[in-house]
Amino acid sequence: MSMNKKCLFVAIFAFFLSACAHGPVYYAKSEGEAIKKDYQDKRLQELYNQNQNLLRELYRRFTSSSVDIYKEGLGFTDFTSTKNVRTYYLMVKVRPQEIMYKEMKGTSDERFSEVIQKYAPKYLKYMKKSDLDIKSIEGLTFGVYWPVRDVCDTYGGFIEYIEFYTPKQFVNEYLDGKINFQEMLLDSEVITSLNQGPATSVKPVFK
């Protein structure tokens, strides 16, 4: 191999290593990174202050089953209904290690379809009805986040997600087995961001 070819190989190899050694990993590496502690809204801050033990329990429950949490993915959020009524929801956003896609393989619609039919119901089952047994909490915001990698399998690329905002009644009915996941989503607000696009409200179609 000539010196020029050796230099070219070294340069390409170094670039690949550099690309794989940097960039966000999109998940919380500790309980402190997983739990959202600071809120601008006074009521949300009160809910956090009163329910820190629940958030810690959720962190332990998911991570003990090797399910990572998105950064600041455990906490509380507000939700305004179509009738312009503001309510407060428990928030759980997971970033499972088993979900990873290559940018050049498949489409964003295919990724969305697989996650919402295969993975979202699976991880929602980790929740318990008692998690929502909190005064002033009207529902659950549950999100599944996943990376779309461009160069290597561990770093780089961008993030996509699905979040659904579901009233407490329908979460409980799903966990009790009274309705299936698809039926639960009929009474949920579903938000997704794909291909680095803006968050969009969608109505999933199951095939």
Protein language model regions, located:
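Short edge beta-strands and adjacent turn/loop segments
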Residues: 37, 41, 45-48, 52, ...
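C-terminal motif of bacterial Sec signal peptides marking the signal peptidase cleavage site
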Residues: 18-19
